[in-house]
């Protein structure tokens, strides 16, 4: 297994990724999460989670592992979500090609930067986005949002991350 990890994980970004497209550099590492559904409603729910990011494949990609609830809080393995995203920089398109998978789900996204936000647009439903904002060395904010047909913005869930 060590050879697999050594071949997968990279310590540095590839020179093929321009600095201005290295959107994930401040997320590399491990994070504690406050996952929030129904923010500001009577059904508001908070779950503690964890999120880990690493450079992969000679620095050409970024992979994460999203675990919610956190491993220390899980009652059984079917509870919550345990998934991974693989992001590969596409120099021809100057964007990130991405896939997220977890049990019974596989979603593809395109990652770009818009107005200081890292926006991951679902390629099968362009009204749905995953958005990273307020990324710093110690914290970040993420939300799953959809432009609804009636013109409103629906925020399905949010994550507030703090570095471990």
Residue ranges of each PLM-predicted region?
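Hydrophobic small-molecule pocket/channel-lining residues, especially in calycin-type beta-barrels
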Residues: 1-164
